[in-house]
From Swiss-Prot:
Assembly and oligomerization: Component of the 60S large ribosomal subunit (LSU).
Source species, domain of life: Eukaryota
Compartment(s) of residence: Cytoplasm
Residues spanning the membrane: none
Function of the molecule: Component of the ribosome, a large ribonucleoprotein complex responsible for the synthesis of proteins in the cell. The small ribosomal subunit (SSU) binds messenger RNAs (mRNAs) and translates the encoded message by selecting cognate aminoacyl-transfer RNA (tRNA) molecules. The large subunit (LSU) contains the ribosomal catalytic site termed the peptidyl transferase center (PTC), which catalyzes the formation of peptide bonds, thereby polymerizing the amino acids delivered by tRNAs into a polypeptide chain.
Assigned protein family: Belongs to the eukaryotic ribosomal protein eL13 family.
Species of origin: Dictyostelium discoideum (Social amoeba)
Ribosomal protein among keywords: yes
Single GO molecular function: RNA binding
Keywords, ordered alphabetically: Cytoplasm, Ribonucleoprotein, Ribosomal protein
UniProt main location, coarse: cytoplasm
Statement: the UniProt record of this protein carries the keyword Ribosomal protein: yes
Protein name listed in UniProt: Large ribosomal subunit protein eL13
Amino acid sequence: MPIHNKVLSNDHFRKHWQMRVRTWFNQPARKIRRRNNRIEKAAKVFPRPIATLKPVVRGSTIRYNMKVRAGRGFTLEELKAAGLTAQYARTIGIAVDTRRVNKTQQSLTLNTQRLKNYQSKLVLFPRKVNAPKKGEATKEEVAKAVQTLKPFTVKSAIAVTCEQTPRKPTEAEKKFSAYATLKAADSKAKTVGIRRKAAEIKAAKAAEK
């Protein structure tokens, strides 16, 4: 079978192809096996969460940047703003990605707050129960600790608020094209250097005259 968005080829079946049809009769059993593996993993890592904390990121390119999704890991800048180091963050269930870079203040603020919320709910078990260090949980907090059995969601991290009451759109809003505006802004940003250079050449020629 071809991969990606390509034309499906005309298959010429020969050599008893009916005996080579791929089947998935083990699908129900695999579902049970995955469920049992999740239960075993939760028991093995108890009391830690079954998944690491991931940042909220936007997909690359104009096609996908309208939607948010879970990223690979938090940037060093986000960890620093939350008062954490990369080495320590990995030990308390926080994913770290040293390659990703914050390009907007919005993403930095959002993920920093996500880290702080995680830390506020985090219960660090002390190595020595009778002598807990600063930041580690007491005996009472350890007794009340609950394991998180679901991955940390991304959608819940962004609060959707409506500041305006419902109203009818104006004629200007109906004619407004968000895609065309973004496309024009993107094109303008790409050609800003070329247009500046052309303007300088034109001004220099005008000065010579």
